Structures are given as structure tokens and as C-alpha cells.
């Protein structure tokens, strides 16, 4: 595929390929990220040594996302695992979830709320719950099985450890 396509394993073992909209070389991206983070740390250290420096009370924090699971005990933030450059996050808009045919991953309707010309659906894949928006007046039956596909060309790829957006592209579930 195009330069920089990334093979991913997601949702408890499902395979997918992310294809960036621009050529991408992840090792160079991670190298630049590390250099920028080091430069920021050095600049902060220099500022902290200046007289009159006041530490920000609203420190910048890495965004922590939460993917719903069927048996979530609580909404608390759990202990973060040790992250590597292999830990990536996908940002997928709800309308990019397609369950009207042509997909490769089986999902089950866990919840559905028709709202006029569209329906908000919760689909279950293994123990994960994803929220989608389906256009049209289709009525979905709780528990019915469908094939999930990801459409749309602006699926976002993030670096999990820094929270920074790497690029946008397409995601093909295999």
C-alpha cells in the first residue's frame, strides 16, 4: 500500500490496516516528537530558574480517552500501562462506523436510539462498546448481528504516550 501503511491489532485481536493520507515514516515522526518534548522540557527548566517564575496551576496533561466496555466497573481512570511507540490511538467519528453491510468484523447491536433521519447505535465487539451514527430510518433490533466497517478518509491516528496527532487516513478492518 501507500508509504507508511500500518498494520494494527485492535479490539481484542482484530486486524486492521491504517493508510495515512500523506506518506508517513513513523520512526522519524517519533524521533521528531522526542526532540520536541526534550526541547520543551529544557525550556521549562530554564524558565523555572528565572526570578519571578510561577508554576502553572493548570498544567498541560495528556488526554486520557475511555473506550466503553460491556462490564465497566467504574468510570475512574485506571493505572496507565507502560507505553511504547507501538501504542497508538485511533480517533473515529461516530458516522464512520458502518453496519449496513460490507464489513469484516461481526458486531452486535447493544443499544439503538432512532432520532428522526438517523439512529445512534451502540455496537458490541467482544467486550468493547462503540458508538455510531447511522443515517436513514433503519430500525435496529437489540442483539441482532451485523458486519462492521469503518468508512471515511479522516480517521485520526494519535501517539498514545504524548497524546499528539500523528496524521489522518483510512482504516480497513481485515
Show which residues each predicted segment covers:
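Non-catalytic connector elements of ABC transporters
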Residues: 1-174
Amino acid at each position: 500500500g501507500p508509504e507508511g501503511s500500518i498494520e494494527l491489532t485492535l479490539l481484542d485481536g482484530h486486524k486492521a490496516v491504517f493508510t495515512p493520507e500523506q506518506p508517513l515514516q513513523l520512526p522519524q515522526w517519533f524521533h521528531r516528537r522526542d526532540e520536541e518534548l526534550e526541547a520543551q522540557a529544557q525550556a521549562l527548566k530554564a524558565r523555572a530558574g528565572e526570578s519571578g517564575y510561577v508554576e502553572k496551576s493548570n498544567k498541560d496533561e495528556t488526554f486520557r480517552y475511555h473506550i466503553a466496555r460491556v462490564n465497566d466497573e467504574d468510570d475512574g481512570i485506571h493505572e496507565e500501562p507502560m507505553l511504547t511507540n507501538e501504542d497508538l490511538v485511533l480517533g473515529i467519528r461516530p458516522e464512520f462506523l458502518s453496519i449496513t453491510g460490507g464489513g469484516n468484523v461481526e458486531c452486535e447491536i447493544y443499544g439503538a436510539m432512532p432520532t428522526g433521519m438517523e439512529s445512534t447505535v451502540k455496537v458490541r465487539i467482544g467486550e468493547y462498546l462503540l458508538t455510531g451514527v447511522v443515517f436513514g430510518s433503519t430500525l435496529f433490533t437489540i442483539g441482532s448481528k451485523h458486519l462492521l466497517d469503518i468508512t471515511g478518509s479522516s480517521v485520526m491516528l494519535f501517539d498514545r504516550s504524548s497524546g499528539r496527532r500523528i496524521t489522518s487516513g483510512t482504516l480497513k478492518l481485515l
